[in-house]
Design a protein with these regions (language model features):
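Bacterial N-terminal signal peptides
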Residues: 4-15
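N-terminal signal peptide c-region/cleavage motif recognized by signal peptidases
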Residues: 14-17, 22
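Sequence/structural segment immediately N-terminal to covalent heme-attachment motifs in c-type
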Residues: 22-45, 50
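Short glycine/threonine-rich turn/loop motifs
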Residues: 24, 48-68
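Solvent-exposed, acidic/flexible segments
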Residues: 24, 28, 43, 75, ...
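A generic structural signal for secondary-structure junctions
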Residues: 43, 54-58, 87, 116
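Short Fe-S-cluster ligation motifs
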Residues: 63-83
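C-terminal capping alpha-helices of c-type cytochrome domains
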Residues: 78-121
Length: 121
């Protein structure tokens, strides 16, 4: 009788445990391989520079020519908004120009952890 109760307790604790922490080092690798063709941390390319993006309002990076949709967006780049953006940019800000998605939740979490780290947050 004690074994089933112990098993239930262990399962309950496992279910309540937080998800694994995002890995910023892996996020850097993913960022460089998947995002680096259009973005960098410090220079605008096809897309805007990303250093300091976490916590910044969309469409406000200096010296980048944003679409009207992004300039007029009220989005602030944080965990949830960056995740939504990487899932489907067009759904978050219709009319924007980015046509790239990151399918796996763990990949998105790691990229976001890297961007947050590079923003000093």
């Amino acid at each position: 009788m004690r074994l089933p109760a112990l098993l239930l307790a262990v399962l309950a604790l496992a279910a309540a445990a937080p998800a694994a922490a995002a890995d910023a080092a892996r996020g850097q690798e993913l960022y460089e391989s998947r995002c680096g063709g259009c973005h960098s941390l410090d220079a605008n390319r096809v897309g805007p520079a990303h250093r300091g993006v976490y916590g910044r309002k969309a469409g406000t990076a200096p010296n980048f020519s944003y679409s009207t949709a992004v300039k007029n967006a009220t989005v602030v780049w944080q965990e949830k908004t960056l995740d939504a953006w990487l899932i489907n940019p067009q759904a978050l800000i219709p009319g924007q120009r980015m046509n790239f998605r990151v399918a796996l939740p763990e990949d998105r979490a790691d990229i976001i952890a890297y961007l947050r780290q590079q923003s000093g947050k």
